[in-house]
Amino acid sequence: MTSYDLIVVGSGFFGLTVAERAASQLDKKVLIVERRNHLGGNAYSEAEPTTGIEVHKYGAHLFHTSNKRVWDYCNKFTDFTDYQHRVFAMHDGTAYQFPMGLGLINQFFGRYYSPDEARQLIKDQAGEFSPEEAQNLEEKAISLIGRPLYEAFIRDYTAKQWQTDPKELPAANITRLPVRYTFNNRYFNDTYEGLPVDGYAAWLENMADHDNIEVRLDTDWFEVREELRAESPDAPVVYTGPLDRYFDFAEGELGWRTLDFDLEVLNTGDFQGTPVMNYNDADVDYTRIHEFRHFHPERKDKYPKDKTVIMKEYSRFADKGDEPYYPINTPEDRTKLEAYRKLAAQESKDNKVLFGGRLGTYQYLDMHMAIASALSMFDNKLAPFWNEGKALEQERGH
């Protein structure tokens, strides 16, 4: 029987970061329990077997951060390419530069607008509603960018994402719709950006590659919990699975959106000429198409010249058993979340369980945010627990 100093449930970036820090910095023996048959949560990638093209199994994952500590930490486990993400939006048979900027505005309205002219144009078109008086998402969006751009690029895309007419969605769902008054069409504005040179799977495996870390794949925490906690009664648990599932849905199910993916290998060297194409119109039921060869142009000599891999992405509400991706966060969800946070705080006190990550805190986290949050938990909760005997407490709001 092996006794562990820490048990981590889930091997996404949050769980792996906590495990790696405990193992490498404090020489703790760590067990990672993972329900899936691979490490890395939704960031996992693998080679498509017939082409060798690296596929992001759960949708495109683009690494970007302005947090130097997070960037330096990640670089311990992988080198990054100089990839910069750019997106195009398909509307009415034309591909537009995205996000909204001078490129899109000039293309859509059919003439050159200077930055000042474009600002005035959007201001005039947005005057139909005031943001403060908007009654629903549609009115709020029009108050920010005007009706023409809203109807072309936001209305149908939002309806597909949420399976709901934007007139039925709350205005509070959007606080801003940024418009750039430059021709810069870089999707992210962060200081650091890139993709792992050898792929996500290699990066994730490097994080877990430590003598003090044991990983058990294909293992459901709820089936082994009692046995593992009995074997290591003093070990804290960091749980990164769904918060409501941990408490057996005692306060009701939290609402999530999920994604479905349709992977195809095509007999062409290039399908769409760009990594991601959004499909903004209602007559196409997917929200976007990923073409993975374009994420790694430096691999062009390794990838086949006559085949490509695309993945269509569809969005819908998650049912029980679906993979949860994005918190819906209705007022009802927030009420349930408050109740679950109280249960989580009590569980931390009574049973040394901390909750983290996207699923464990019911919040959308980019990869760099999950890593930063995990580093904070290690620094502020776990290290003081081991080094100073401080009690474990769940952070407020997490």
What is the role of each PLM region?
Residues 92-97, 102-236:
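Active-site/ligand-binding neighborhood in enzyme catalytic cores
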Residues 20, 24, 209, 376-379, ...:
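Short, well-ordered alpha-helices that flank and scaffold nucleotide-derived cofactor binding pockets
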Residues 2-14, 31:
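Beta1/beta-strand and adjacent pyrophosphate-binding region of the FAD-binding site
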Residues 17:
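Short alpha-helical segment within the catalytic ATP-binding CA
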Residues 50-127:
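Dinucleotide-binding Rossmann-like beta1-alpha1 core, especially the glycine-rich loop
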Residues 7, 20-49:
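Glycine-rich FAD pyrophosphate-binding loop
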Residues 25, 219-346:
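Mid-domain catalytic core of redox enzymes
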Residues 323-398:
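C-terminal catalytic lobe of FAD-dependent flavoproteins
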